[in-house]
Amino acid sequence: MNIHEYQGKEILRKYNVPVPRGIPAFSVDEAIKAAETLGGPVWVVKAQIHAGGRGKGGGVKVAKSIEQVKEYASSILGMTLVTHQTGPEGKLVKRLLIEEGADIKKELYVSLVVDRVSQQVALMASSEGGMDIEEVAESHPEKIHTLLIDPQAGLQDAQADDIARKIGVPDASVPQARQALQGLYKAFWETDASQAEINPLILTGDGKVIALDAKFNFDSNALFRHPEIVAYRDLDEEDPAEIEASKFDLAYISLDGNIGCLVNGAGLAMATMDTIKLFGGEPANFLDVGGGATTEKVTEAFKLMLKNPDVKAILVNIFGGIMRCDVIAEGVIAAAKAVSLSVPLVVRMKGTNEDLGKKMLADSGLPIIAADTMAEAAEKVVAAAAGK
């Protein structure tokens, strides 16, 4: 689950990470009032969407008067902001953050992610803040410093100081940088975040260390123990299909293709999408019905896929381990009838009760295209989507 910048800064503030004073605004009038409350002479008007690259897209403006705050708030609120992370369709801006200006002397970068290989937390830091870390990694990889943190020990003072110096923090500001880094780590750990990023972490002219931005992503499987994080959820920023899928415990992600995919198991789902692409097709979604799929879940999965007008064919690829093929077949038949299926349907089943499942499909009277291998299924569904 993602949250907005101003919400991320609320979290950082709780963990003693210095952030600028700022007030969220949902209208132009609220933006003006926020600016007046903060006082000048400089304010930053920031679009609040769940995507990076807002500055380059015109979603961050520096205002030097209340009139400019009004002007920028009017132009940003309601705009469709397109960045490299939103895709060409962009995101509608419904919230702003009005923030006091900062005296930026140097911009730094710091982030935390889970390193699954080492089973530790990876801290990445760079002296090249304020830009995409991917660009830094490509052009100046030597400027990215990585530290693996033992979760049982946490981020130690000496480690934080060493990283701070490596990214160019002067000695006089190292204690402040240590506080910011350790606060970020503690916030990351205690909220079950999967990513926490400050870009940029700035040094001001008088040597202060301040988090000028905040990005958090949380492990959805851990949200049950963080109601305070769930309260930050903004459904307007999420795909309506993915919200609907979550109601039925379906793992669904919208994609840009025209072939709907219904698979049990995340690994098999990814392999299925890869195979579709290998045969020249484009998946319209990732959809994992899990190991406990019921007729209701399969029916809802079909409804979700068919709400996408771009879907021209559907591939059901099932491995019957925990899930029996006859149960899936029953669900597929019921779902196809319930939604009056109007696009070609390719089904491939392997595993428990495979023969029974195939017989049920064959006897259903539905125009189902059968396949024995994943390659055959992918080839057939790509052809069907192309109208061949």
Swiss-Prot record:
SUPFAM superfamilies in alphabetical order: Glutathione synthetase ATP-binding domain-like, Succinyl-CoA synthetase domains
Pathway(s) of this molecule: Carbohydrate metabolism; tricarboxylic acid cycle; succinate from succinyl-CoA (ligase route): step 1/1
Entry GO terms, CC: cytosol; succinate-CoA ligase complex
Domain ATP-grasp: 9-244
Top-level taxon of the source organism: Bacteria
Chain residues that bind Mg(2+): 199, 213
A GO term for molecular function: magnesium ion binding
Enzymatic reactions: succinate + ATP + CoA = succinyl-CoA + ADP + phosphate; GTP + succinate + CoA = succinyl-CoA + GDP + phosphate
Record carries keyword Zinc: no
Gene Ontology BP annotations: succinyl-CoA metabolic process; tricarboxylic acid cycle
Enzyme class name: ligase
UniProt remark on cofactor binding: Binds 1 Mg(2+) ion per subunit.
Keywords for this protein: ATP-binding, Ligase, Magnesium, Metal-binding, Nucleotide-binding, Tricarboxylic acid cycle
Residues the entry annotates as binding substrate: 264, 321-323
Obligatory cofactor(s): Mg(2+)
EC number of this enzyme: 6.2.1.5
List of residues binding ATP: 46, 53-55, 99, 102, 107
Assembly and binders: Heterotetramer of two alpha and two beta subunits.
Family: Belongs to the succinate/malate CoA ligase beta subunit family.
NCBIfam families: PRK00696.1, sucCoAbeta
Function text: Succinyl-CoA synthetase functions in the citric acid cycle (TCA), coupling the hydrolysis of succinyl-CoA to the synthesis of either ATP or GTP and thus represents the only step of substrate-level phosphorylation in the TCA. The beta subunit provides nucleotide specificity of the enzyme and binds the substrate succinate, while the binding sites for coenzyme A and phosphate are found in the alpha subunit.
Name of protein: Succinate--CoA ligase [ADP-forming] subunit beta
Organism for this UniProt entry: Ralstonia pickettii (strain 12J)
Gene: sucC
